From Swiss-Prot:
Gene behind the chain: ppp4r3b-a
Annotated source species: Xenopus laevis (African clawed frog)
Short name of one Pfam family: PP4R3
Coiled coil stretches, renumbered: none
Biased composition (Polar residues): 750-761, 768-790
Single GO BP term: regulation of double-strand break repair
Chain segments carrying region Disordered: 682-712, 750-820
Compositionally biased tracts (Acidic residues): 682-694, 798-809
Protein name: Serine/threonine-protein phosphatase 4 regulatory subunit 3-A
Domain WH1: 1-100
InterPro entries assigned to the protein according to its UniProt record, in alphabetical order: ARM-type_fold, EVH1_PP4R3, P4R3-like_central_dom, PH-like_dom_sf, PP4R3-like
Any GO MF annotation of the entry: protein phosphatase activator activity
GO CC annotation, single: protein phosphatase 4 complex
Family classification: Belongs to the SMEK family.
Function: Regulatory subunit of serine/threonine-protein phosphatase 4 (PP4).
Amino acid sequence: MSDTRRRVKVYTLNEDRQWDDRGTGHVSSTYVERLKGMSLLVRAESDGSLLLESKINPNTAYQKQQDTLIVWSEAENYDLALSFQEKAGCDEIWEKICQVQGKDPSVEVTQDPIDESEEERFEEMPETSNLIDLPTCELGKLEEIADLVTSVLSSPIRREKLALALENEGYIKKLLQLFQTCENLDNTEGLHHLYEIIRGILFLNKAALFEVMFSDECIMDVVGCLEYDPALAQPKRHREFLTKTAKFKEVIPITDSELRQKIHQTYRVQYIQDVILPTPSVFEENFLSTLTSFIFFNKVEIVSMLQEDEKFLSEVFAQLTDEATDDDKRRELVNFFKEFCAFSQTLQPQNRDAFFKTLANLGILPALEIVMGMDDLQVRAAATDIFSYLVEFSPSMVREFVMQEAQQSDDDILLINVVIEQMICDSDPELGGAVQLMGLLRTLIDPENMLATANKTEKSEFLNFFYNHCMHVLTAPLLANTSEDKLEKDAVFGSIKTSTVCPDNYQTAQLLALILELLTFCVEHHTYHIKNYIMNKDLLRRVLILMNSKHTFLALCALRFMRRIIGLKDEFYNRYIIKGNLFDPVINALLDNGTRYNLLNSAIIELFEFIRVEDIKSLTSHIVENFYKALEPIEYVQTFKGLKTRYEQEKDRQSQKLSSVPSILRSNRFRRDARALEDDEELWFNEDDEEEGEAVVPPVEKTKPEDDFPEGYEKFLETKKAKELEDKENLPKRTSVGAFKFTFSHSVSAANGANSTNSKSVAAHTPPATSNGSSSKNTSLTTTVASTKGSLIGLVDYPDDEDEEEEEDASPRKRPRLGS
């Protein structure tokens, strides 16, 4: 007994009077003890589970239909059907049923004839041949055929049944012969009916029918039928477009005829889906899912066939990179690769990985480097699209290539620099290409998609490469458009204000906005790399010049850059902003904006509100001390008054701390803290240098020491120390940067109401015990003044620098007293 002969589908009739498929299995007839009789058993072919166990009842009416169906009812509302794969299997089981019931197997119904409604019910069951009678395929029946096709679309089962009938009778080819007849006779009514018929057949969503309709023999006639939409006054000329306008170009001759046919077919079917067929309504959205799948699998097959033909791909790459290749040919080659990569998006992830690795091994990136630098706009645009596919697929692969390339090439011809230059030189007034390239650059420099392995850290290596070899190319337009060759005094604040004319050209402003967006991304994600670059180039000052631009969007980009920096709450950045007086252009922009309530106004106020809410003390102090007079009239928000309140609260807090500590301990504590702060600052710079692997400003290469922030900051600290020495008797004193410094330099004798100017008088006038002290503390006071530059931290400071020098000279003679 053959398995295929006994292979069946089991169906049951549901409450909606539709047949439900219960599974496929193999049927047998055997005696079942539990049921006390011969029974039909169907076991699933997938796992052997029991799909059906039905006793052959002597009184049940079994009906044999269409040579491969057996239908019966076991209860009032429980109808069953077995659909056999082969007629022979159906005959064998039918004989068993007839044997149990004592009937002649030649009959088609074992009991009284089944009522007509039962037969009609089973007409709804799928996978049965000839369950629908198709009208004769002739001109006079076209309207009837169109009505039939249209009527079944609302019922999935009826669609299935019609599709089977169309397939079995070769009906589609007969319809297309009628189409040619109607065209020859100019039978417009018949052509309109054929449009409805062919459109309806497409909506049957059957792959077997698509194979017929989209064959070389039939597809152009199918397109022809779809030209005659009854809703249009004149037919469309789709066939003319496909045969005359759309030209198939073989950049390299394709020797595989099957591949060529598959490419033609895919293009035409895609055209039918995208251009000819109307957009499906919400009720029809699933009707064309098989058509989409048909195109999808065609593309997969095309990519696979091309990928396997290494000779073909090698030849394409060779011609693409050959200097002798003319521009037209190169354009065709690049467009081919663009389509090739677009098709690859249909592949499964593992197959797509293999596809791009094949392209990488063949040299796609060096080839792109060549074509992206060409003058032809179409070629550059196609190359950009290909590059975007590669970056989207594997940013790491692109990064690895450019880092290897950097070891052998000049910066000017590096792939990333070529990309940056294309972004900068985009001739599109709307900078469409530049926006796309900026997005790709951001993906490449995004640490989130960089790998960290045991052997190497991609993030560190690539960012070092990018900042050393590429960042200067990216920022060149920004620095060129913000040069500071003319300076003038600001009458309001007495600060330096640039008189540079900002770029008013809209396209240039757009480009600078893109560059600023990328730099803002770097501030958020690159920490010390971008920090070094900003300091070395004094970049924030240059960016803030753009606050003067007539293009508000550019001024907002500049402000956003500063806002991101301040948002980090990094004191290193804060000191840089204070030292450079970089709030000046922001406040100028706020005042120049006047009473206008716009985005610029809100963004600037939000910046200061952030400083207030986060209580960034150094910036609060700087703003209040230097700009409050100008900001005080702004009362429609409480931000600036809030900053002043914060400032005064901090001032009071420091004063209270000062007054709560005895003067001798104050002197000890605060002097130590001041010196410890300096040590911490030096330690911070040292740690920063170690972390980055390069100095904040390389000392050997430095040509303008005055621009070096760390060195300038040391000078600033020296100035601060001198200021402290001058004002040591006055508490508190405001430093030049606007922060409050509490330094206590009183001598011990001063604390005790005596005047003393040297170490001897300190020793002579210090009482034996001071503030719970003892004579041992006396000794420590006189001995720890040994050296202001030594390893010991002095507890007492002196107002006279010369006295300090004398003590320094005398220190060797005092050192033995440490042990006494």
